[in-house]
């Protein structure tokens, strides 16, 4: 989840491309995203949408219709009915009425409720600005106006919007990389491929030899295997048997090693469990959970 770089003037450049934010030492970095769905994804504030000038002015006027942060009523979060399930900008205050975070959401009530469950000590009240036409440009402008106002008054960014503060921000977990058994097909191995396979399955709790990667399986059986292992919350390794660059010769070598003719193949604690059908059966009857624990 990317951060948003904002200079002291909070000026956005007119480029439609998503660019990697450049952060100088003196440039505050603040975060727009809510931890909880439904929120919008804005990779950076160093861009605007490809609008005409009238369109940009229209977005500004719509966003400006939202009351200023100071003028907006502070609502107790405990009174759930008072928080609308609408799109817009919202500001979370702690029990001492100190601003903690400014975010945007398609459902403000749901986002605030989720914040309350996650960090109740930081959620005492909330200010809400409903945006009638919640496209990205309008919501960004409304959020920007509230942030600008707070910085102008206090000289600082709300804690939850600072770079590195993930209290209110959902972090997308990085998927584990797939194992590459060799440095490349044109590199001569000093250890036989079968020995590399043997080391891997014996030194890892769970290894799945699949078609494709864990993030993009190339067959339904491999996708099913990844889904089952993910559901178990187990740490597991994946090896792409279709990767002829870094796993060249793996398919035939693995068939000989395991004496199993098809893929995917799943090993648990050094022993072959079988393929997708067997793993699915073990998952459904509870046996898989037992051998993984």
From Swiss-Prot:
Binding site for [2Fe-2S] cluster: 219
Name under which the protein is recorded: Bifunctional monothiol glutaredoxin-S16, chloroplastic
Compartment(s) of residence: Plastid, Chloroplast
Activity regulation text: The formation of an intramolecular disulfide bond negatively regulates both the N-terminal endonuclease and the C-terminal glutaredoxin activities.
Broad class of where this protein is predominantly found: plastid
Tagged with keyword Nucleotidyltransferase: no
The protein's assembly and partners: [2Fe-2S]-bridged holo-homodimer. Interacts in vitro with SUFE1, BOLA1, BOLA2 and BOLA4. Interacts in vivo only with SUFE1, BOLA1 and BOLA4. Interacts with SBP1.
NCBIfam families: Grx4 family monothiol glutaredoxin (TIGR00365)
Comment field on protein domains: The N-terminal domain (NTD) (63-170) has an intrinsic Mg(2+)-dependent endonuclease activity in vitro. The glutaredoxin (GRX) domain (194-293) alone is able to complement yeast grx5 cells in vitro, but not the full-length GRXS16 protein.
Domain of life: Eukaryota
Example of a GO biological process term: monoatomic cation transport
EC category name: hydrolase
Outcome, altering residue 143 to A/E: Slightly reduced nuclease activity
One of the record's GO cellular component terms: chloroplast
